[in-house]
Amino acid sequence: MLQKRGRGLLVLLLMLLEWTRPGLLSPLRPICDLRVLNHFIKEARDAEVAMKSCTEGCSLSESVTVPQTRVDFDVWEKKNGLEQAQEVQSGLWLLQQALNLLRTSVTNTALHSHIDNSIRNLLSINAVLRSLNIQEYTPPASTVALEGTWRVSSATDLLQVHVNFLRGKVRLLLLDAQACQQDVS
């Protein structure tokens, strides 16, 4: 038994030494692990599916402003990191405002947990951005001044925008974040 335990500790030690050996890529910071974002995307899709199957008490009370989700890669790559971060943060803020309105509009209680989850996930993404030293976003006094937005009037459209925004611009920002780049030690 002692030999088994000793071998296990030796294997663990060798794995740690191999992992931290100079000259190899350093492991990603946990905050940069895209599996977290993938989980948020899955939950956003679940909310969208639940909304599509809803027949009663699941509509928006008014149309809402949401971010554009289409990414022109030539334009995106010409933007500096601060501009990209501001675009993502303004989109997250718009989605949070829209989801808060949806939460108060929807009377179907089965959807409340999906909407609450989506709002919590947006707050978590904002916390991730802060931990990556991305400057805090200051929302505008009015959404009229925001570029790259449009309006949706259905809850399903809102949740589809939510999914696509996470899959697109949020993912791109996290992939390109300086703190998430793997450096050779």
From Swiss-Prot:
Q: Which GO terms describe its biological process?
A: erythrocyte maturation; nucleate erythrocyte development
Which GO cellular component terms, listed alphabetically, does the Swiss-Prot or TrEMBL entry include?
A: extracellular space
Q: Which positions form S-S bridges?
A: 32-180, 54-58
Q: Where is the signal peptide?
A: 1-22
Q: What is this protein called?
A: Erythropoietin
Q: Which UniProt keywords apply?
A: Disulfide bond, Erythrocyte maturation, Hormone, Secreted, Signal
Spell out the InterPro entries in the cross-references: 4_helix_cytokine-like_core, EPO_TPO, Erythroptn
What exactly does this protein do? Erythropoietin is the principal hormone involved in the regulation of erythrocyte differentiation and the maintenance of a physiological level of circulating erythrocyte mass.
- Extract the GO molecular function terms from the UniProt entry: cytokine activity; erythropoietin receptor binding; hormone activity
Subcellular localization, per the record?
Secreted
State the encoding gene.
epo
The record's similarity note reads: Belongs to the EPO/TPO family.
